[in-house]
Regions:
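Short pre-active-site segment immediately N-terminal to the catalytic Zn-binding motif
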Residues: 118-133
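Inter-helical turn/loop segments and adjacent helix faces that build the functional surface
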Residues: 145-156, 175-182, 241-247
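Auxiliary, metal-adjacent structural segments of Zn-dependent hydrolase domains
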Residues: 51-113, 127
Length: 271
């Protein structure tokens, strides 16, 4: 597992006067079908702090609070536990003007692709919370690896379980105080109402593009991140009734429907 320090790219931009597109080439080459303009539009949407004269000090301030070697050691330890893939991780400072991420996600955001991970966080994020973000995303990469899933094949239920399991692992490895803020959203009664009225009927949908509004919420009157929180509650409900806790690797390989126990039992898988 390699962590790419984007601060070095920005230094080359300022010192060698290289274009941002050239210095960011190690990432841009991962998806050559995307133009540099498309790439940077996507990165800025996800929270990237822009690279310009006005943000130069912010880039330096962010980098002072990042220990790349320590983060790499941590993720390599997780790779050993998860028997996960050799993934490349690209880390970036978060734009403090990105209110949705600062407020809704506590100043950190991550996206996992099959062979690489993007991670963004605010300059003041403590190291243990940086680890929590990287653990969450690397857990996704490991589950996709073990389950043989991709963007087109992954079901709504699998996506929900992935989110719940990743946060369960964060609590196990780093403590509950470092879990994502959305794990504390919404009570059980509300979640079960959404599950019974809506979600259980769509768990077999495949391809992330087909169920985006269900997973992320915020549309069609669905509260934000309802799919995420349901996934966590399904995982928590299932594992809290286990007499002997299953190890991390066993859980990574476990089929999503086997987590549907207690009030989350459904007939969808038996029709």
């Amino acid at each position: 597992v390699t962590i790419h320090d984007s601060f070095k790219w920005v230094l080359n931009h300022y010192i060698k006067q290289e274009s941002v597109a050239k210095t960011f080439a190690p990432l841009l080459e991962k998806r050559p079908e995307k133009s540099p303009e498309e790439w940077f539009h996507f990165l800025h949407e996800q929270g990237l702090l822009p690279v310009n004269s006005e943000t130069k000090k912010e880039w330096f301030h962010w980098r002072k609070n990042v220990n790349v070697k320590e983060l790499e050691l941590f993720i390599k330890k997780m790779r050993s536990i998860f028997q996960g893939p050799d993934t490349e991780i690209f880390i970036f400072p978060l734009n403090r003007n990105h209110g949705a991420i600062l407020e809704g996600l506590d100043g950190k955001n991550g996206i996992t692709f099959p062979v690489f991970i993007l991670a963004f966080w605010k300059a003041t994020l403590p190291e243990r919370d940086q680890k929590a973000l990287l653990l969450h995303e690397y857990h996704h990469a490991s589950r996709l690896f073990h389950r043989g899933e991709n963007e087109r094949s992954v079901s709504l239920l699998e996506s929900m379980i992935m989110e719940g399991l990743a946060e369960w692992e964060v609590a196990k490895q780093l403590g509950e105080t470092h879990m994502a803020p959305w794990t504390k959203n919404y009570d059980r009664r509300m979640l079960l109402a959404w599950w019974k009225d809506v979600y259980q009927h769509y768990v077999l949908l495949q391809g992330r593009h087909t169920y985006k509004s269900l997973l992320f919420g915020g549309e069609r009157r669905i509260p934000p991140l309802t799919g995420y929180k349901l996934g966590y509650d399904i995982v928590r409900t299932h594992l809290s009734h286990k007499e002997a806790p299953e190890d991390s690797l066993t859980l990574l390989k476990k089929a999503p429907e086997t987590f549907l126990t207690g009030p989350y039992k459904t007939n969808e898988y038996h029709n």
